């Protein structure tokens, strides 16, 4: 990474957005589980380092290939930064939120957990049902359709990084304040 690019606002292209959508719903049709973390303002370096480092343009074919059963990279999450997949097989923090439905597994708990500690948008594809869900800000929106996923990704795509940083700091402060009360 070039030092002067560190603070550059990184957003993904429409092509990346559409490839993510296409891959998620293709995997859903054949019930291939997936966990895709779309990084925003907060760098996910700590979680990125738990996986296998990659530097690959996002494409629906690559995403589908990564999560294919019995392949070396299918377990864990991938992290997307801008238009690139930067890491695969990443471990994410699990949510300890007791309000999460008991019928949801580790993948969904990890999605919510990651969204509790960062400003990332986390997309899951259920291996059991094929349903696509999104976690953001500690909330899980289950069984969304292609249009709804497109709206969520467009919101992320067009947010300013300064707004994201302020919201993340506020959320972190609130969570810390709740634990100390």
Each model region followed by its residue ranges:
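Divalent-cation
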Residues: 1-181
């Amino acid at each position: 990474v070039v030092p002067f690019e560190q603070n550059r606002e990184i957003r993904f292209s429409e092509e990346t957005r559409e490839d993510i959508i296409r891959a998620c719903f293709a995997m859903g049709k054949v019930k291939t589980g997936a966990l895709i973390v779309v990084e925003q303002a907060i760098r996910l370096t700590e979680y990125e380092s738990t996986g296998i480092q990659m530097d690959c343009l996002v494409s629906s074919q690559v995403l589908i290939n990564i999560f294919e059963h019995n392949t070396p990279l299918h377990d864990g999450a991938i992290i997307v930064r801008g238009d690139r997949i930067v890491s695969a097989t990443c471990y994410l923090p699990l949510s300890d939120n007791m309000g999460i439905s008991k019928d949801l597994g580790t993948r969904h708990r990890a999605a919510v957990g990651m969204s509790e500690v960062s400003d990332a948008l986390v997309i899951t594809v259920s291996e059991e049902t094929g349903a696509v869900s999104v976690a953001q800000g500690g909330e899980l929106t289950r069984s969304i359709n292609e249009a709804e996923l497109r709206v969520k990704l467009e919101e992320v795509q067009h947010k300013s990084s300064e707004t994201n940083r302020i919201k993340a700091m506020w959320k972190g402060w609130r969570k810390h304040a709740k634990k100390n009360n």
